[in-house]
């Protein structure tokens, strides 16, 4: 990786230089975030301009937002039209998701969706984990999807193998 989002926002490179095309999915591009950047908040207006430009070039622009509601959250959400709140069915994660949804409600987004990740039906049956209905009731949103828990996801992340190229319960959710 030669350039990242901060390089792009600081005009150290052109968009085509910062975009990384996925080798397996030719229509999928990424712009890597800077690993360390304390001055990220200085670029909110430039990010908004960049996202506006990307919307003209691409059908979808996904911004992976850090967990929680710190500066990175506000920065990432500033240019969004729509949000997908991803949570696991653990009480603490659902509470955090509830706080995020409350903040998003005040940001004039066209749509806020819910995606439940790392869902373990066996644990739900044993009443050791919140059910999909529990999560939906607590957050006041219907889930657009439920991704089953799968140990192979951890393996794929650690080895850099795209999840969608593996045959797992989680990939079947897509």
Language-model features, listed with the residues they occupy:
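Short, hinge-like loop/turn segments at secondary-structure boundaries
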Residues: 1-3, 103-104, 130-134, 161-165
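P-loop NTP-binding site
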Residues: 142, 152, 161, 172
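Conserved catalytic-core segment of NTP-binding enzymes
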Residues: 45-49, 53-149, 155
């Amino acid at each position: 990786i030669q350039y990242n989002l901060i390089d792009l926002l600081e005009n150290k490179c052109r968009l085509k230089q910062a975009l990384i095309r996925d080798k397996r999915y030719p229509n999928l591009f990424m712009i890597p975030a800077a690993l360390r950047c304390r001055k990220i908040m200085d670029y909110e207006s430039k990010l908004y301009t960049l996202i506006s430009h990307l919307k003209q070039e691409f059908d979808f622009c996904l911004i992976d937002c850090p967990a929680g509601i710190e500066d990175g959250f506000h920065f990432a959400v500033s240019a969004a039209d729509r949000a997908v709140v991803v949570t696991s069915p653990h009480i603490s994660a659902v509470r955090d998701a509830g706080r995020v949804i409350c903040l998003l409600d005040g940001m004039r987004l066209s749509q806020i969706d819910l995606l439940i990740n790392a869902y373990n039906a066996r644990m739900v049956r044993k009443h050791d984990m919140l059910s999909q209905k529990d999560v939906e009731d607590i957050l006041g949103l219907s889930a657009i999807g439920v991704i089953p828990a799968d140990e192979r996801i951890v393996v794929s992340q650690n080895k850099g193998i795209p999840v969608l190229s593996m045959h797992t319960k989680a990939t079947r959710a897509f």
